[in-house]
Amino acid sequence: MKELIEYIAKSIVNKPEAVVVTEERSDDSLVLTLQVDPEDMGRVIGKQGRAAQAMRTLLRVMAVREGVRVDLKIV
């Protein structure tokens, strides 16, 4: 899941070298934190939050398969 978010984020930002995804796992949940350059924040969130929502939806689909709860934080 971490690799998917990293791939998507790097493909839409202007500074892909600034993309960092960290992962925190607990028993049945996973929190992914996506850090991007402040100039690229708008691109990652997207118009009316559509890009961020699409990434979260993809994560939920993958999480159902693995039986975990997932959350994406964009900072």
Put a short name on every predicted segment.
Residues 1-41, 47, 52-75:
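RNA-contacting regions in translation and RNA-metabolism proteins
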